[in-house]
């Protein structure tokens, strides 16, 4: 018989840097998760993606055991890395802060494909381009 799900926790944590300190510790503690067990597993699983923010969905069962699934980094984080900037524009319609090429957008769309609700790469590219424009990035090509 399948275990009963008690709670689902969604967090965005820097890869390889989960610690019991806030905000991770309190969120996991409220859900009844073994905090040290989760942080060790998460850090081991994401050690190769250093510098990225990794969304994670933690499923907590009634017996206080848990499973977690890591997702691909948010499109905004991948776009900032591709453009080489710290943050997007405060006024994206008037002030452009960076440029990204269609090739960079396609690469990000292919990376994000498994997490996006898109039928093909072109649809995923349009989603990523929309994110880029809303951050004040210019899409070339």
UniProtKB/Swiss-Prot annotation:
CDD domains named among the record's database cross-references: Ribosomal_L11 (cd00349)
Alphabetic keyword roster: Methylation, Ribonucleoprotein, Ribosomal protein, RNA-binding, rRNA-binding
Leader peptide range in chain numbering: none
Keyword Nucleus on entry: no
Domain of life: Bacteria
InterPro entries linked: Ribosomal_uL11, Ribosomal_uL11_bac-typ, Ribosomal_uL11_C, Ribosomal_uL11_C_sf, Ribosomal_uL11_CS, Ribosomal_uL11_N, Ribosomal_uL11_N_sf
Pfam families: Ribosomal_L11, Ribosomal_L11_N
SUPFAM superfamilies reported for this sequence: Ribosomal L11/L12e N-terminal domain (SSF54747), Ribosomal protein L11, C-terminal domain (SSF46906)
GO molecular function annotation: large ribosomal subunit rRNA binding; structural constituent of ribosome
GO cellular component: cytosolic large ribosomal subunit
Post-translational modification: One or more lysine residues are methylated.
GO biological process: translation
Record's subunit section: Part of the ribosomal stalk of the 50S ribosomal subunit. Interacts with L10 and the large rRNA to form the base of the stalk. L10 forms an elongated spine to which L12 dimers bind in a sequential fashion forming a multimeric L10(L12)X complex.
Protein role: Forms part of the ribosomal stalk which helps the ribosome interact with GTP-bound translation factors.
Family annotation (PANTHER family): 60S RIBOSOMAL PROTEIN L12, LARGE RIBOSOMAL SUBUNIT PROTEIN UL11M
Family statement drawn from the similarity comment of this UniProt entry: Belongs to the universal ribosomal protein uL11 family.
Protein name, per record: Large ribosomal subunit protein uL11
Organism: Lacticaseibacillus paracasei (strain ATCC 334 / BCRC 17002 / CCUG 31169 / CIP 107868 / KCTC 3260 / NRRL B-441)
């Amino acid at each position: 018989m399948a275990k009963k799900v008690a709670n689902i926790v969604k967090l965005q944590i820097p890869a390889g840097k989960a610690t019991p300190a806030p905000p991770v510790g309190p969120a996991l503690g409220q859900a009844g998760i073994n905090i040290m067990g989760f942080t060790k597993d998460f850090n081991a699983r994401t050690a190769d993606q250093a510098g990225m923010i990794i969304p994670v969905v933690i499923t907590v069962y009634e017996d206080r055991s848990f499973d977690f699934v890591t997702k691909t980094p948010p499109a905004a984080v991948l776009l900032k890395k591709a453009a080489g900037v710290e943050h997007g524009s405060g006024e994206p319609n008037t002030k452009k802060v960076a440029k990204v090429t269609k090739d960079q957008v396609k690469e990000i769309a292919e990376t994000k494909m498994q997490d996006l609700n898109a039928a093909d790469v072109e649809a995923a590219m349009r989603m990523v381009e929309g994110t880029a424009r809303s951050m004040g990035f210019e899409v070339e090509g």
